[in-house]
Regions:
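ER/secretory pathway lumenal C-terminal domains and tails of membrane proteins involved
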Residues: 3-189
Length: 189
């Protein structure tokens, strides 16, 4: 699926401003290294993780444990200041999940504590991106469902990182060569 696109860029010079990313290779540190560097006329992909957080043997998979959600909500209700200092203002916001849970060095918190993640949508960024949407139809949040998943693998985590960091600066297109369940039900977003 990506090889013809790579050919077009490499040999024909077509769309060298676009970045082709093979999601099955995104499981490897050497490929992530390539994605965090500019290529042709395309800037790097928005992956903010330091290499030590994705190198081989690190973040190969992270368990999804939605049973922890109620305990976290209880902590936010009973001790809001301490909870916000620990996990950010929005506990299930994608950026906070990646920062405080997925990339945690503490084994006690190195998991995903929910099966529903959120990305708060910057409506001004969407408008500036040139998307043809009426202002009143831009939702406040994008919902990412992990229902039925026991774990996310490195390629899944990198895809979530791209979504979390992109802020509508560049579009993300995904070729669906496998079932939608492999893409965290992102088909409608």
């Amino acid at each position: 699926d990506t090889f013809p696109l790579w050919y077009d860029q490499e040999t024909e010079g077509i769309r060298t401003d676009a970045r082709v990313c093979n999601l099955s290779y995104l499981q490897t540190d050497w490929y992530i290294d390539q994605m965090v560097r500019p290529a042709y006329n395309s800037p790097s992909l928005p992956i903010s993780w330091p290499r030590l957080d994705y190198c081989s043997g690190t973040s190969e998979y992270v368990e999804v444990n939605p049973d922890a959600k109620e305990e976290i909500l209880k902590y936010y209700k009973e001790q809001p200041e301490a909870a916000k200092a620990t996990w950010g203002d929005e506990p299930f916001e994608l950026k906070n999940i990646l920062k405080y849970w997925v990339r945690s060095k503490d084994a006690e918190t190195h998991f995903i504590p929910t099966d529903t993640l959120y990305v708060t949508i910057d409506k001004n960024a969407v408008r500036k991106s040139g998307m043809m949407m009426a202002s009143d139809t831009i939702p406040d949040r994008m919902v990412i469902s992990l229902k039925g998943k026991n774990a996310l693998y490195k390629s899944d985590l990198m895809m979530l990182e791209l979504i979390a960091q992109s802020n509508w600066v560049r579009p993300i297109y995904v070729a669906m060569t496998v079932g939608q369940e492999n893409y965290m039900n992102l088909g409608d977003n």
